[in-house]
Amino acid sequence: LTAAYAAYHLSLDGKPAPAIDNLTGDQRFFLAFGQDWRSKIRDAALRQRIATDVHAPAQFRAQTVRNIDAWYAAFDVKADEKLYLAPDQRVKIW
């Protein structure tokens, strides 16, 4: 996600992304990521997938945005909000 976000900003070539439907470019980027992981699955199918698939279920993959500082800035996420993760707890790989 971090690499995709950096690539997105490189594609803007230093220009600001236009606001569309009152959403900034960064907000649209993160919303698109979340929508990509939307899913609806029955409990039995989820249990079977957890037992056989090496990948985490979609609801856990979508929450990786909590580790990206830009997500907090894009949505003005505050410390008292449910998805807030303190900066010293955010995972940084690159």
Task: Give short role names for the model-derived ranges.
Residues 1-94:
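Zinc-dependent metallohydrolase catalytic domains
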